[in-house]
């Protein structure tokens, strides 16, 4: 089955520079320190995943590759894939700015099949990606993420508390369906909001189990609004 990945809308959004993340996400740094490799001093790390070889990680939906670069800062072989060619080109430039050459580590892909072998990665990270597509496509992709991942999958998803952020669902306290974004930011892209039960539905056909999970909710004090994100570590 072919899915509408909204690739064109994603490219337009990147073309406007809307999703260019030039700084690492704090939660990803915490995940690496808690589960993968703890930074002990400027030069020292304690590896938390047993492996005779250098660790390999996949940044799924890498955008301009700032988290892929972060993996290399942790001396991990980080690979990034994204459906946006614009983003990948920018990511290769950005990696040079940080003193890395990630020409062979960042690539655009078709949005359907991850171009790596089974269990190629010790872990995968994915920040705000699997919630930017139809749920049925996300369910297909998490199976492929499971295929290429040996152990951990760290991901973040927009929560049902974020109904407030979209015109179509503004009057609903909780909403865990899908909306096509009408607002200027990310216009035309899909947002799929997650409740706990939808997360369970999302992973039920995989061997992943929830190892760690937090729901972060934010409330506006000046303009009244609420939004939330799930942060999860899944383990095989």
Predicted regions span which residues?
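Class I (Rossmann-like) S-adenosyl-L-methionine-dependent methyltransferase catalytic domain
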Residues: 1-57, 63-113, 137, 153-236
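Short, well-ordered alpha-helix to beta-strand connector turns
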Residues: 75, 121, 149-150
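Hydrophobic pocket-lining residues that define ligand/cofactor binding sites across diverse proteins
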Residues: 95, 133, 149
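Short amphipathic alpha-helix with an adjacent loop that forms part of the alpha/beta core around
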Residues: 114-119
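A conserved beta-strand element that flanks and buttresses the S-adenosyl-L-methionine
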Residues: 125
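Short catalytic micro-motifs in class I SAM-dependent methyltransferases
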Residues: 128-132
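A short glycine-rich, Lys/Arg-flanked "PGG" loop and its adjoining helix->strand segment in the class I
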Residues: 139-151
